[in-house]
From Swiss-Prot:
Native species: Staphylococcus aureus (strain MRSA252)
GO biological process terms, semicolon-separated: response to stress
DNA-binding region: 87-110
Keywords for the protein's UniProt record, in alphabetical order: Activator, DNA-binding, Repressor, Transcription, Transcription regulation, Virulence
Function text: Global regulator with both positive and negative effects that mediates modulation of several genes involved in virulence. Also, modulates the expression of genes not previously implicated in pathogenesis.
Pfam family, one: Staph_reg_Sar_Rot
Gene Ontology MF annotations: DNA binding; DNA-binding transcription factor activity
InterPro entries xrefs: HTH_MarR-typ, MarR/SlyA-like, Rot, SarA/Rot_dom, Transc_reg_Sar_Rot_HTH, WH-like_DNA-bd_sf, WH_DNA-bd_sf
Entry protein name: HTH-type transcriptional regulator rot
Family stated for the protein in its record: Belongs to the rot family.
Amino acid sequence: MHKLAHISFGIVGMFVNTCMVAKYVIINWEMYSMKKVNNDTVFGILQLETLLGDINSIFSEIESEYKMSREEILILLTLWQKGSMTLKEMDRFVEVKPYKRTRTYNNLVELEWIYKERPVDDERTVIIHFNEKLQQEKVELLNFISDAIASRATAMQNSLNAIIAV
């Protein structure tokens, strides 16, 4: 019996040790998993800044080449998509700081991208139109923007995938 008890205690001891090892492995795996999840989450959230940097660099490249601000580019893109509209209507699509508003639209007029019209019946309203004479320049600008996006497409897609995985 003594030998059997010794074997039983040995088996119980091994079982306890195995359970302790298993518990240790599980705890460490959970900590590793949490750390990995936390690291992946942090990385994904940080990719917001990376993606924003890529987007800002596209606008900077456009600004450098075409001497137009981000707001001016967005105004043109909105006009091309939605058509002519009042300045008040445009405010719903493109946010322009009040202190920059007049200068922004006047710059587009000076560059001849747009022209303004005041209806006869309401002198307070200003309607802006794309200057159709610049159709070729429009195509060139759109191609330039498309190329700028394409050159960063993989990096932006990777950032977006990491963000979505959060």
